[in-house]
Amino acid sequence: MDRYGNSEIVQYLYFYPDQYRFDIRNEIDWAEDHVLLRDYFPVDIHTNEATFDIQYGNVKRPTHYNTSWDFARFEVCAHKWIDVSEDNYGISVLNDCKYGYSVHDSVIGLTMLKSSSYPNPDADRGHHTFSYSFCLHEGDFRDGDIVSKAYAFNNPCKAVTKQEKNGKGNGVGSVFDFC
């Protein structure tokens, strides 16, 4: 648990022995004014562009600020994932509800919360639970099957109990449905 001003931030890390992946689940009680909460991740990947998931595909953006146009695009919208890759390996960040990213040189930035005063002075105040995941892969995001992994991360399987066909009983059956 960490504190920032009047806010409380808890991060849980999950490591998987059979995957090149780890997850970070965040629980944040946010009570700040005029603060942008970002997380930064330095990576050992050197490339001139990063790939961002957008609504009907993906888009590449530079990882440097050579022009005023590059500098103005300090943050890029991405839906489910971003990827930074060299020729034969890379890292992708998957998310379940955060959409503002930056990649500058070899540092990935993720905007977690923003407490602005306009248009809604209460925006992002209160309790938040969200997760993101880091996936290491060979090749680029296509070789790493990142699109499928991002969909699986956003739509995990959930086990639910099934009622008996006649509707009688306590409502708990012995058969599971997976959706």
Which stretches of residues belong to each language-model region?
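C-terminal (or distal) subdomains of carbohydrate-active enzymes
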Residues: 1-179
